[in-house]
Amino acid sequence: MKIFTSTQIHELDKYTIDHEPVSSINLMERAAKAITHCIEAEWSNRTPIVVFAGPGNNGGDALAVARLLADDGYQVSAFLFNIHNKLSNDCALNKKRLIESKRIKQFTEVSVNFEPPTLTPDTVVVDGLFGSGLNKPLTGGFAAMVKYLNSSPAKVVSIDIPSGLICEDNTYNISANILKADLTLTLQQKKLSMLMADNQKYLGRLKVLDIRLSPEYIQNTDCRYRILEENDIRGIMRPRDDFAHKGSMGHALLIAGSYGMAGASILATKACLRAGAGKVTVHSPKRNYDIMQISVPEAIQQMDPEETLFSHPVDTEPYNALGIGPGLGSNETTAIALIAQIRRSTCPLVIDADAINILSSHRAWMQQLPKDIILTPHPKELDRLAGTTSSCCYERLMKASELAERLQAYILLKGHYSALCLPNGHIDFNSTGNSGMATAGSGDVLTGIITALLARGYDAPSACRIGMYLHGLAGDLAAKDLGKESLIAGDIINYLPKAFLRMED
């Protein structure tokens, strides 16, 4: 699914109107019918409905919904806020249609003073104040209206996007002036701001309504953002060769685990094997030898000369991919070995966890990273890499994207919607995964999966896309059977086979 900017959304509407062809008012009616259908599926016609409509096309949608609900026997009160005595053409036409229908319980056009209605826990508020065209924080009376609605006990359904939430960048927005919906019915596509963790409290449940906007425009229009879905991943996964052998399935090298952190190397290694690498070698301190041999007998153990830490780089000539960082520690000896390892590596690289933290502490080394390297930071690790703390998720995402462009690297910013920032400035969001995966070791598992895919011959962007999708899918399948509360990283590994099977169906 592509994610268009607010400007592209406007252009998509216009293209649909011009090329379907369909009039703008009929397109608005189409959207209103889809919204009305969802509301009627949730609440019976005994539910009191209060509609708040703004002066633009979002308000026009809301007025059309008010009319359709009233036609279906709902008791509807509608308030149209026309402070500047200027309505969009379609909003004005839907106002006329609503009044002429004569089925609405109450219609009030507000131009100066507003006496808000009493809202009870049984009331459903339809929010059509502002939509995806909003480009600045709400102020004045509209901000006061949002605060009033947020303090009310009523259920709130937002049309397209909660009023006050900006489609993309909310860095300088005012949280108190953004409506908190219980249900958001967004039209055609999710908006970028809906993928940011700090905006989830405004959305409630989120549903995407297909209102049949031009598929031709959607397909042919390049956009910076997209959400990866199952068909996208199926399209880049290769069928397994029936004549494959362990030599043809790739040899992965993992440099992971300091003393006391052998668990990270175990998790990464098991995940690497489960993701289909033909052979996996693990380079770890001497003290980890016994536990590694016992825990992952399928892997080849390679011991560092040091007892407790990574101290010497490894010749990567025999390997098809290298993953480095899980449980590595940040000892200065390890730091020096890390940069030496990066300099001499001849195979594709995945940098994670402590290896990222070491680079953050030695920022000059980042300029020595090879092109197409993969880094998989969580939000705080990304802030350390960027050198500044981000005030919001959007700001952090932009920093990750800028860093990916500057380094010509692939930066996979982990989160609920993990974001793969590409060297060309584009960003792919993952659509799988759940909150149960917020557990120690989950990132180590992801590193193992991506390293395996690189070793198997996938290029960096494909390995990242497939890797994060399968990682999340395995977590979803595990959560379905085990629940989210007790999910651990090992469960993700155990459900990787089912994730692969799902993609083979």
Feature-to-residue mapping (PLM):
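Nucleotide and nucleotide-moiety/phosphate-recognizing core
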Residues: 36-129, 137-159, 337, 345
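Internal gly/pro-rich beta-alpha loop/helix module
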Residues: 122-124, 129-223
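Short gly/ser/thr-rich secondary-structure transition/capping motifs
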Residues: 105-113, 139, 164-170, 233-238, ...
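Short acidic-hydrophobic sequence patches enriched in Asp/Glu that either
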Residues: 87-90, 141, 176-179, 488-491
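Small-residue (G/A/S/T)-rich helix-start motifs and N-terminal tracts that mark the onset
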Residues: 1-82, 88, 183, 194-349, ...
